[in-house]
Amino acid sequence: MDSRDWTQLGCVAYPSPIHPDYHAGPASTIAFDNQDELLWIGTQKGFAGSFIGRELKRFTAFRIHPETDGPLRQFLFVDKGVIFLGSRSVYMAARSGVPIWSIRHESMQDLRAMSFTSKGTSEILVAGWQNKMLVIDVNKGEVVKELPTQDQYSFLKMSRYICAATNKGTVNILDPITFTIKKQWQAHGAFINDLDTSNDFIVTCGGSHRQTHNTPAILDPYVKVFDLKNMSAMNPVPFAPLAAHVRMHPRMLTTAIVVNQAGQIHVTDLLNPSNSQVCYTQPQGVVLHFDVSRTGEGKALADNKHNTYVWGSPNKIQFTEIGIPPRLPDPPQPSLLPPDPDMLEELPLSRIGLPYYREQLFSALPPDIISDVGAPPQQIDPNILSTLTKTDWGYIGPNKTGLQRNQYMDTRSTMKTSNTIRAPKFLSEKARESQTGSEDNTLATNETAMMTPNNDHWSLRPEAPPEYRICEIKYSKFGVDDFDFGFFNNTPYPGLENNITNSYANSLLQVMHYTPLLRNMALQHAATACLADPCLLCELGYVFDMLQKGEGPSCHATNMLRALNHTSNASVSGVLEDIAKDKNPSTLVKNLTMFLFDKISQDYKGTPPISTELERTLFKLNQPPNPLDLVKRLLETDARYQIKCMHCQHVSPRTATTFVNKLCYPAAKPNIRGMKAQRITFSQVLKAGLENEAVNKGYCTKCQRYQNLDQRKIIFNIPAVLALCTEITTAEHRKLWSTPGWLPEEIGIIVDQGHVYCYEGDDLKLHLNRGIHNITVYSLVGTVVNVETKSPQKSHLVATVNVGRAEPESKDQDRWHLFNDFSVRGISKVEALTFNAAWKMPVVVMFQVKAANHRFNMDWKTRLDTSVLFRDNNPHALKTYELLDRETEIPGPDTVIAIDTEFIRLKEREIHIDEDGKSKTIRPISHAIARASVVRGQGSREGVAFIDDYIHIKETIVDYLTEWSGITPTDLDPINSQRNLVSPKTAYKKLWVLVNLGCKFLGHGLSQDFRVINIQVPRNQVIDTSIIFMKPPSQRKISLAFLAWYLLKEDIQQNTHDSIEDAQTALKLYRKYEEFMANGSFHDVLEALYKKGKTLNFKPPRISTGAAKDAGFGAVHRVGTPPVPAPGTTEGSFEISNSSTATTGGSALSATGGMGSASASSSMPSTPVRKPIGLGGPFTVAGVVKPSPATSLDNFGAGAVGTGITTAAATMGGGYGGYGTDGAYWGGPNDMAPTSMIGGSAFIPAKFPPGPPETRGFIPYRPQVLLAEREAAAAAAAAAAAAAANNDVGGRGGVACGNGGAGGEQGKQE
């Protein structure tokens, strides 16, 4: 970070001299926006203003609160807007100034600071110089909690904890969940003037009294530093000019920026304070406020003279990562009428009279008159442009349009009529009609015609037929899943959906997929341990694997196309349709072909493939080849340019390795009367393109001047995959391609002494029969075709592919298909190879060596690299999972795993509104996976998660969907997240490996999960509980929450969704299903389930509702996934035994102590799950417990099973060690813990330990017990208390309870 080139880039006076707050004082606070290129400034009387970019151009200004409330204190930024803090109110508004909510509360007396909490941007904590703190729900705009406090706070900043600066110079560390003080430091003697935090550090500036408290405090000549990780103070950083303000650099984690009141800026490394840089600013007054932008490139200072300055490097500065300025309002349109002095602004329009009239007004147009004002101008046909001659004033040429001079065309008539295939009915509509028997067969004829082979050559028609035109996806209220893709494809070859950005690549992906060498290359690489992100070769392998496994009519390449956005040089290569200068589909796909072949060759060289058996056999190699040599043989045209000066005959060589070759057409020769025009063949054009001989102007090093240079390419090797760009630019080129049979199915190439010879047709057969030369035969795999349509319809790309090349050897090798995105149908060879100069021209042609047809190497499936499943990508993250054991837990075809995912929203849906006001969805809402959890489905650790990945999203996130996903911005922040944050590639690779190992995926509503993950799982590997518990005639799928409530008596998804919990619940439902099938009661249970669901509208009643109480249900729920215990410890493990023990042989529950998690011997997960409580049955009394006199509270709860007693009134188990839930218990000999049991499944304590359970470092349970049960248990406890009075009952180890439980029996014996 170099501060030497910093300079003042902008300055603004706010409040300005004309502002009503000018005389009240200078700015009260400043802050950089974290999303838009804005700097916000607050005033002393409650105004806020925002300014754009380095020039500080005025954007918005509006009042936040009345001037009697005093100055504006602080800004906080969220996706939807800005939160403003005043002394007596909290206000939220959009960045444009539109208010969202405002809160005034009786407890708001003198607020000074606010901060986000553990729930991310959905909740804030506000505090000040008052005795109460308040928690505010940002989404609802209401106070949800009031917290008393003994300290008065001036600053709040969120990092690992909430760091709070008091008005007495101390720094308090607050728990972000309970808001209790965990640590306190005395930072400065009198006051703290500024505070900031990073992930691990706190830095403060402040002042102290130099002699006595009666003397005024002055600023300290140092910056105090505290280590949050180790909870310790570090050596202060000296700052002789007296530190007034400090900020941590947002990108350089150990760098702080310190400013004094005169504007002197020091950039200091906290770990090496002697290494610092200094920058001198020239403020007009004393610096009152300072802030640094999110990128660290912009610095803002505000002085007491109403000026705010922006400093930074003039060559590189932007406030946010993206750097997009906010959208400005449209400027007002000037009035077309001259100003009228009589038209006063206060004059109502009703005072202006209208003349009397008897004839019809001119504005009353009859309905048959059409006004086409504003219609878009007609696009000029490219075919016409190619025939025009350029002049000094424009272009001139023959009029072939059939229209007269200056005659225009009704451009809207073509918009109203669409020559496309009529869209089918939605699947939901068909289902309703089939149930009612009113199915409409009007589309049956269309569908039959669509799928019945037609011998008519569509390519000979003057315009593109419907089969070649753009196919649009229609959306119902059920989204894209309701669209009938099967209507457009009844072949076994999946299409690709086109509702994704950059989906123009679909046609090229289909051609590459059916090129066996490219498919094998991608899959062999994807099966390696490659975790590079992005890696386009891996992404191609995943797409090809989806298309191979595809059992439906369509797939989508979302992940591949997203990875394209993040690949280096993609934006400058013209392959991203949103930002490409030339958006013509043919140009885009040509650029993409060259870009992809270059990138996948680099990726292939980086990691050796799993197997090279196919390549060794094909190229007759003895040893495993080097990846560099393989790339040359597979993709590279090995050549060298020979550049010869036409003047001095000097020859200079230059390497000319290419992956994609361009065809070169001979110059048109004038027709000579009486001579037959020479026929130009494809082989001649190919030879000219490979050798690329041309004469160009260039610099000759020998002549030392520009001369005509003869450039010729000497070829040494032609690759096995020959990708060609057609480079069709003139009408002559179109005429060539329109010649029937001009593109051959096979070509032969001979490379001899740097020369290339190409043959086709009879010439090829002749050379093959003679067998003199070493000729390589190439087969045509497919073409990418540009379908040109007249304006306003858009041109687009389709693919014609011979899928027979990529299938096992068969008699019928010519199996041509037309891939029009998700519309796929078989076509004849003649149709595939016929082109039309008017609308059908090829852009990319793909050949492959004939010897590689029908050849596959499936070794990658048996040699799949599985190391990603056993690698911990983030050892320091919060552990909510346990990795698989390499020795005992090897996934395979018999492995059942339960999966659930959580999503975030990347883009809102795009809507197109027609001129008649009708709207339709162009692109649906775009989601991305943010969390993926996979739990074991069998074995001794059934229900224990072994994958719990949070995904680092690189795109801009529109909505975290926290209410439904449980995902907060902090979870996905690579700097502040404590989660197991991984790249999208790593998370996807784990699931892809499990699919290809044959594991069975169990979950609820998996189709949506798989769609967002963008993975194809074969049907025989999917177990979907939403389908298992679906009554076929109803076609209604029941929610996971309702199934859990009804079948498992558990109330899940109380506060948010937790993917581990949902996966565990789906697993338990499947076990229930197996149980019902075993005893033959499944159909009866299903009937009762739907009957109960209809009465409750298939929504589970929550515990607080009367319906839940009437049903007799109780539940324990949690608010997140607690961490699993460290390996080798027994902390927090629960063991449930179903064997009969002790006197009456009931079920028993024992706890082996600890704090937090549970494991079960009978298929219960070690991650704590909600357990039913209050279901009736016999009552027992848990053992009386007390800690050992030598045991402190901190280490209480880690011993062996304690002692207990039993009486006729109740069974009393051993002591309960620690408190692993907030229902955990410790106490004296006379304390009783009543518990309601059913089958030994749960327990309830009678009292809680002092202090909130969150201070013990775990996520609490919230047990609820019916009042009647508590009273009954208390009565039983009283009877047992007398017998237990003289017994030292309890201990540190655990509790055992149940009818005749083991702990009670042990207590009896002792």
Swiss-Prot record:
Record comment: activity regulation: Positively regulated by the regulatory subunit par-2/pan3.
Needed co-factor(s): a divalent metal cation
CDD domains: PAN2_exo, Peptidase_C19P
Catalysed reaction, written as an equation: Exonucleolytic cleavage of poly(A) to 5'-AMP
WD repeat segments: 22-61, 67-105, 106-144, 145-184
GO molecular function, one term: metal ion binding
Ranges where the record places region Linker: 318-463
Pfam families: PAN2_N, RNase_T, UCH_1
Binding locations of a divalent metal cation: 900, 902, 1009, 1062
Gene Ontology biological process terms, A to Z: mRNA processing; nuclear-transcribed mRNA poly(A) tail shortening
Domain Exonuclease: 897-1070
Keywords: Cytoplasm, Exonuclease, Hydrolase, Metal-binding, mRNA processing, Nuclease, Repeat, WD repeat
Signal peptide: none
CC cofactor note: Binds 2 metal cations per subunit in the catalytic exonuclease domain.
Enzyme class, spelled out: hydrolase
Binding site for Zn(2+) 2: 645, 648, 700, 703
Compartment(s) where it occurs, according to its Swiss-Prot or TrEMBL record: Cytoplasm
Enzyme Commission designation: 3.1.13.4
Lineage top rank: taxon: Eukaryota
Notes on the domains: Contains a pseudo-UCH domain. This ubiquitin C-terminal hydrolase (UCH)-like or ubiquitin specific protease (USP)-like domain is predicted to be catalytically inactive because it lacks the active site catalytic triad characteristic of thiol proteases, with residues at the equivalent structural positions that are incompatible with catalysis, and it cannot bind ubiquitin. It functions as a structural scaffold for intra- and intermolecular interactions in the complex. The linker, or PAN3 interaction domain (PID), between the WD40 repeats and the pseudo-UCH domain mediates interaction with par-2/pan3.
Annotated family: Belongs to the peptidase C19 family. PAN2 subfamily.
Stated role: Catalytic subunit of the poly(A)-nuclease (PAN) deadenylation complex, one of two cytoplasmic mRNA deadenylases involved in mRNA turnover. PAN specifically shortens poly(A) tails of RNA and the activity is stimulated by poly(A)-binding protein pabp-1. PAN deadenylation is followed by rapid degradation of the shortened mRNA tails by the CCR4-NOT complex. Deadenylated mRNAs are then degraded by two alternative mechanisms, namely exosome-mediated 3'-5' exonucleolytic degradation, or deadenylation-dependent mRNA decaping and subsequent 5'-3' exonucleolytic degradation by rgb-30/xrn1.
Protein name as it appears in the record: PAN2-PAN3 deadenylation complex catalytic subunit pan2
Originating organism: Neurospora crassa (strain ATCC 24698 / 74-OR23-1A / CBS 708.71 / DSM 1257 / FGSC 987)
Originating gene: par-1
